[in-house]
Structures are given as structure tokens and as C-alpha cells.
Amino acid sequence: MELEFLGTGAGSPSKSRNVSAVALKLLDEIKKIWLFDVGEGTQHQILNTTIRPRKIDKIFITHMHGDHIFGLPGFLSSRSFQGGEKMGPLTIYGPKGISDFVNISLKVSQTKLSYELNFVELEEEGLLLENDRFKVYAYKLDHRIECWGYRIEEKDYPGELQVEKLREAKAPSGPIYGRLKAGEVVTLEDGRTIDGKDFIGKAKKGRIVTILGDTRQTPNLKLLAKDADVLVHESTFGKGEGKLARNYHHSTCVQAATLAKEVGVKQLLLTHISARYVGKMVKVLEKEAKKVFPNTKVVKDFDTFNIPFPERKDDEQ
């Protein structure tokens, strides 16, 4: 599981930062990639990575501001050209209006897609989707227009079958191991009964990634970010600009760091950086946040972060 940032700027592109887009790479887990926001130029950014558009099967849009959606029509069109009929379906999740924006853009440009395109427009907060490996939750944020944050929870991995322990118990190898790993109670040929649950190691705890759209401080942030292994939070303003952040419905680096500290986040990644912050000023943002939450980084375009499995606490073992 990796995060790769395709755009980390705020509002409009600059020489050093493109506008918002981040890829959650789940290639080892489900052989897929999920995109969060698709600002203008995202497909150009993808060309500078190893990301293959055919691997992207879900796109999550936080809100309808242009710096988060203007790259969608071009990306969808190029995805069609690159894969033809072999391209699998793609689903876009986002606020009301996202389907109109995409469909009208494709219609007026007479763009025909070679793959199935589906939309899920968000209405209710809570569980958005669930598959064998992940749950995704969506909750409203506090921005000038409807805006959402996403919490991706990986399900726990089942423990490994303890083969050495089975050998010590003189349990015969073979198909019986499969039944024991499934947690069944098995009767052996010698009449003994063994419970598979006694021969399975501890489960490996799944990871949690929280990706937020533009927002000022709101109670839902704690709900979204609690115990996250990685929190991706906007940082449009610096420490001394709290009033500006409030007025423009954005956040400061210190507000993001305070949230991370309060809810047990493991790592904080700050994005949506204003073009006013360049060179040494970026380091100032990071330094301000680190005073509150040390494991903080201001990200730049093409930064990639591996998300390790969390260590279990003693009371979870």
C-alpha cells in the first residue's frame, strides 16, 4: 500500500506544484489504484510515474472546485484510448453534480468511452463501500461548498497457521490443514479432536488512511482521522493565519498537526500548499507543524509513501 502525490498545490498550478490529485496504490492488496481528486493536468503527471490508467478503477472526488475536478474529462478520455475494450469499468464517487459535470463534458466534446463509467453521488455520511479487503467511509467537511473526507480502512489479515505447533501435536499434514486454518474443529484418525482456532497466530491489523478535502475545523475531522496510520490534510495557511483560514474555509498547518496529535494519527502529510509558500517558506510550514506533531511532512509532487502495518498494542494481542 502506497500513496503517490500527483498534485499538491492550492487553487491553481504553479511551476513547482500541480493542483490536487493523490493516488492510493493497492497493487499488492487488490491489484488496483484509487485516485482522490483529479485536478487539471493530472494525466500529464501520471505520465511521469509508473501508474497505469487501466489499474485505476475508482475515483473519489472531495468537492466540485475546479482545482479538484478539471482533470477528469481528459483523464477519462485518455484512459479509453489507451485500453480500448479491454479497460475495466470505472466508478466515480463524489458530491452531487459530479455526474453532470463529467457527462456534459463528454457529450459536448463528443467523447465516447470504451468502458463502463458509473457514478455514486454522496448523500448520506458513513459507510460508502465495502469489499473483501477494504471499507471506505465518507463524512462531510466544512468548506465553502459541499466537501467530503474519506477514511479507508483495510480489514485485518487472518493469522497464519502454526505448522510447527501442529507437528508437535502430531496432527497429520494434508487437506486437514486447510480446514484447521478455516477455524474448524477436526477429529483426527486417532480419535483426538483439535480446534483450528488454537493453531492460528495473531491477526495482522489492517491499515487506515484518511484523505481530506478542503476544510476548516469541524467535528467530523476527528471521526475521519482517529487512529489513522496516515492522515492527508490540507495546509493552505501557516501558523499565524488562523483568521484567514477560517474566513476562506481552509486550515493551517498547526490546526492539522493538532488534530493529528489529538486523535492518535501515526503520520501527517500536509498538502494543498499555497503558491505563496516556496523554498524556505515550505520548511517553515513543516517546522511549525512539527512543533505540535513531530511525524509531519509537507509533501511535494511525486512524493511516494509506503504505509507500513501498524504494531499491535499489548492489549490487542
UniProtKB/Swiss-Prot annotation:
Reaction catalysed by this enzyme: Endonucleolytic cleavage of RNA, removing extra 3' nucleotides from tRNA precursor, generating 3' termini of tRNAs. A 3'-hydroxy group is left at the tRNA terminus and a 5'-phosphoryl group is left at the trailer molecule
Record has Hydrolase as a keyword: yes
Keywords, alphabetical: Endonuclease, Hydrolase, Metal-binding, Nuclease, tRNA processing, Zinc
A Pfam family the protein falls into: Lactamase_B
Known cofactor(s): Zn(2+)
The keyword Zinc belongs to this UniProt entry's keyword annotation: yes
Main enzyme class: hydrolase
Cofactor binding mode and count: Binds 2 Zn(2+) ions.
Residues that hold Zn(2+) 1 according to the record: 63, 65, 143, 214
EC number: 3.1.26.11
Active site positions: 67
SUPFAM superfamilies assigned to the protein according to its UniProt record, in alphabetical order: Metallo-hydrolase/oxidoreductase
Annotated GO MF terms: 3'-tRNA processing endoribonuclease activity; zinc ion binding
Residue numbers binding Zn(2+) 2: 67-68, 214, 272
Protein family (similarity comment): Belongs to the RNase Z family.
UniProt function note: Zinc phosphodiesterase, which displays some tRNA 3'-processing endonuclease activity. Probably involved in tRNA maturation, by removing a 3'-trailer from precursor tRNA.
Record's subunit section: Homodimer.
UniProt-recorded name of the protein: Ribonuclease Z
Lineage of producing organism: Bacteria, Bacillati, Bacillota, Bacilli, Lactobacillales
